[in-house]
Swiss-Prot record:
Protein name (database record): Cytochrome P450 71B9
Residues that bind heme: 440
Gene Ontology molecular function, alphabetical: heme binding; iron ion binding; monooxygenase activity; oxidoreductase activity, acting on paired donors, with incorporation or reduction of molecular oxygen
SUPFAM superfamilies hit by this protein: Cytochrome P450
CDD domains, sorted: CYP71-like
Source species taxonomy: Eukaryota, Viridiplantae, Streptophyta, Embryophyta, Tracheophyta
A single cellular component GO annotation: membrane
Compartments in which it is found: Membrane
Gene3D superfamilies named in the record: Cytochrome P450
UniProt similarity note: Belongs to the cytochrome P450 family.
Amino acid sequence: MATIWFLSLLFLCCILLAAFKHKKRRTNQQQPPSPPGFPIIGNLHQLGELPHQSLWSLSKTYGPVMLLKLGSVPTVVVSSSETAKQVLKINDLHCCSRPSLAGAKELSYNYLDIAFSPFDDYWKELRRICVQELFSAKRVHSIQPIKEEEVRKLIVSATESASQKSPVNLSEKFLDLTVSVICKAAFSLDFHTSVLNNDGFDKLIHDAFLFLGSFSASNFFPNGGWIIDWLTGLQRRREKSVKDLDVFYQQMFDLHKQENKQGVEDFVDLLLKLEKEETVLGYGKLTRNHVKAILMNVLLGAINTSAMTMTWAMAELIRNPRVMKKVQSEIRNQMINKSVITLDDIDHLPYLKMVIKETWRLHPPVPLLLPREVMSEFEINGYKIQPKTLLYVNVWAIGRDPDSWKDADMFYPERFMDNNIDAKGQNFELLPFGSGRRICPGMYMGTTMVEFGLANMLYQFDWEVPDGMVVEDIDMEESPGLAVGKKNELLLVPVKYLGH
């Protein structure tokens, strides 16, 4: 009898083991392919200094849908327009939330902002208000006089350099332009003559970007990573950055209380008015911390990204004289006898728009769209994507995908001439602002800033490389971070155009 029981038990164990192996094999077949990793850290070591480039290289081996283990966090990366469409459009509702990220949590006052807040009724109501009030076409047009004034200042500065035949640091000038416009639009303050004009403000923005884009162990090891962040001093530096930002916000609020302002309502005016009206957002009323979190999105989302795009565009143009000549001819032939190009003029400059789209294709300001968190199971190319998985869309890789773009490494704006591809999130080959429910709400504001600034610099000046250099010396190396700009500053010599 004992023998029968033993044999029966052994037989049952064999059946269970076979079933387990079959289930495991089936599960593995349903998961996306994965590069091999190490225990504990998984694939973290494969990200490198520029993760979008490293992930692009891995996708050439493992395909456009990859599963990685970043520490203890399962992460899926998609790298083609077709898989991006499945994520951002077809299955958007399954994966439009945000993960918990240490830096984002603190900078957004526990996810009270638009960019990093999880998907819920609060986020939907906040986004609706911001789209209607802060980032509407009406609001963008209302700050056009600010842009025109700041561009005139930039033209004066570049004209002085042209008279001396000295180089202009365009990386610095474009950043200064966007900072000046945003500071006036948000705070009604002149960056050059106000309390903002000091290294402290620049450091505030730089540090905030740094903490959002730098490695934080808490993000990859939720149960114990905070210890590493504490030991390395990251947590202390992050807390100081948030405290400094808090002081800055309060300073802006105090200035608005003191002033009896007239004219265009700025962003702080609007947000403080919504706070005073006790505007309801999902589960509660809009508070001062909500206002601070939204201002953080405005500062970080608008300043660096627009400046980076203008810098990349000028770098590509100086390296491609044919394109430079063609876009300048279009602008100058269209804008005869005008001192400054206006926003209305931009609609008559189709080739300029192609140049900007081509710049976004090769140099998207945020090459890995902000991570999404999967809320419910869905499939990409037959692979099952599980809840709580992090999901990245590599728009940098998509812009270089030979299946979507002929001669993908070439800067060739004419590729947009015979198609209707735009950057508004419906064409998944070109996604500088993302797509779906999480598309950048400030897309129109950012686009007009780039178009306006770039058009005027190309209209007013011809551009040359400094003495002792040739165009091939202009490098295209990238700087690491959440938003990826040109690693080395772009210095060019302006030559005043006298034909207008």
